[in-house]
């Protein structure tokens, strides 16, 4: 199975299981320049060719205002995919690091970026926003909520923002980190290095490392956590009987 067919097997299943895409949708795809969002864009662009429900996609980047960031290669990538591309210039980095000097900036940054993305999606006449969170992200988010907030919770596979009249979808839900890496190794894309000084210095990075250690000593633990989320119907997750094989890659 080639890399695109493999990826689409996960994406199509998630989209169908949660009815993420409907006839006539105009979907904004949030593009950070990282491998996850670019992989999602490539998958949704390819799936337009054969998915029975016709839809349009618009790629949207929220430029945080860091110096020296060039989106021209991403723009060319979108042109090749025949996808409209919008870059929204903001001062988020300046506000967080220079004005407010936030000691723990990640939460505020995410909130501001989400607000800008949702506003631009509305401006582009989109009714849905697709985000690049995948299988491992779901497990990590669930565990972070358990460890640091003492609650059972995660982002939802599909959710509706009534104040924005936007539906958020996560089509990479069944694709693992290894699946995304497998795709990127075989399908060159303009993956960018994050200019954020807090990159890799977060609680999420710590949780990623903890889960990797648990997986090493307890094979399949992430798969079982994901399964438990579905059995418990945590935040809209549901049991369908078909999940990824814990990131198993056939080289």
Model-derived regions: residue spans:
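The feature marks non-catalytic terminal segments
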Residues: 189-251
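A general structural signal for short secondary-structure boundary/capping elements
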Residues: 105-110, 131-133, 174-178, 217-220, ...
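Alpha-helical structural motif
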Residues: 3, 7, 70, 176, ...
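Catalytic subdomain that performs nucleotidyl-dependent activation
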Residues: 57, 128, 136-216
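Short, basic, helix/turn surface patches
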Residues: 110-122, 158-164, 211, 215-230
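Residue-level detector of flexible, active-site-proximal loop/helix-junction positions
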Residues: 64-66, 92-94, 159-162, 175, ...
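ATP-dependent adenylation/nucleotidyltransferase module used to activate substrates
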Residues: 1-140, 148, 178-186
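Charged/polar, solvent-exposed surface patches and flexible loops
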Residues: 9, 13, 17, 76, ...
